[in-house]
Amino acid sequence: MKRLTALLLAAALALSLAACGPEGKAADTVRYGLSNAWDALMPYNSPSGSNYSRIIYDKIYDRLAYVHADGTLEPRAASSWESADGGTAALFHLDEKAAFHDGTPVTAEHWTDTIALLTDPACPTLGRSAFAVLSGTDDTGAAVPGEALGAEAVDKYTLKLTFKTPTTPEDFLLDKNREYYVLPTHLLEGTAPEDVMELALWDEPVGSGPCKFVSETPGSQLVLEANPDYQLGAPGFDRLVITVIDKSNLLTSLIAGDLDYYAFGGNVSVEDAEVARAAGLEVLEGTVPNSFYELMLNNETIPSAAVRRAIDLALDKEALCLHTAQGLGEPAASDLTPGTGYDSGLTWARNVDGAKALLAEGGYDGRTYTLACTANRSGLAALMQQELAEAGITVTIETVDSATLFAGMADGKYDMAIASHTPGALPLWFTESRFTADNNLFHVKKGRYSRSPMAKATKR
């Protein structure tokens, strides 16, 4: 089994909010690093839907449950749940101690009002597709006029969700829990659905999660404080300072004591592992794939399936793995993580001559494509640029932050962009979450669907 050297810190345990309890000892200020910025503080208005944004939402806002990596569930906003109506509905018994940061109790009505707002076709949310599993919605998650919406407040603290097909509460939570946050709808009264996303409230958000908003320097730093009244107990710190810092500065920042924890991208090279050990940091090796890299393609600016396939064949994924994971990666031939139960057994092989033939077939005219990447992937982008040039494809690189990258893909500004995600229980999560009517990053036109090839490599 291939192995990846990964750097882990004991400080990470202090931020495992699932383990927070009233007996947690305050740790004053915890300094937390991210390699990319969040793109919104409103959880249903994120162009990227990335973990860099979700990690922020999970602290400010609350979800129904915790879903652990092994698929087990623990209460969060809901203290318990059960099936109803022969398996077509689920009852969530909300924690009666839960409250928004302004002191207002969180009720089932807040949940139903949140869902009603976001399924309203007039509301310009980017997260509507998550509600398409509920009865009374169409395939995009928009409420169908004249039909009862599958979100009901049975009583003050009981939320009932009704599904289009029989679904256990556990299956629903495994699939959609990360998409459902309760909003302070009592602060939205009198606001038209089409105006909700523009409210100043989202600049200084009020949630019901374990941390309260203090201040933000957009794209650079976010300061939160512990919520002493959180129903599961206050986090074990007083203040949390989240700073965007380049991945190349990870080790030096940790060693210098400028950071206590670094989320996402905490892997170190084999060479840097010795530096980390020498500084007294514990270095562990893992065998589970922890990064999945994608080259997202704009199907509107690259309309030919032959040209898109040529891009896939022109890339040397072995070289990309060597660059990104010091050879501890594995090329992928599809959206599915190799070696998992969902893997179809497809194999990959580079074929530059085949790519050239497909370019001719697709009528590629030598135009220059724009490839967007974040700073920590600039080396990977340069290698892709070189490999594509060997097949005759001209690419220029634009280095931007994560929020700009995903917004640019959504707006059609870029022809291609490098992204990555952490593989999980849902094998098509990355593609599905960015391929919806409201957030079609691949720009696949209705009625002209063809699978958007994304050059993939997994890192273990």
Where are these regions (language model features)?
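N-terminal lobe/hinge region of extracytoplasmic solute-binding protein
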Residues: 33-85, 206-207
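A structural "hinge/loop" feature
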Residues: 34-55, 77, 104, 170-183, ...
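Surface-exposed binding/hinge segments that line
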Residues: 131-189
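Gly/Pro-rich hinge or "lid" segments in bacterial periplasmic/extracellular proteins
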Residues: 176-235, 239, 352-353
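Ligand/substrate-recognition segments at binding pockets and active sites
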Residues: 218, 360-423
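Append "and occasionally in soluble cytosolic enzymes with long acidic Gly/Pro-rich linkers
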Residues: 225, 303-386, 390-391
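Ligand-site clamp/hinge motif
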Residues: 227-272, 394
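Extracytoplasmic/peripheral linker and loop segments enriched in polar/acidic and small residues
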Residues: 309, 321, 343, 396-405, ...
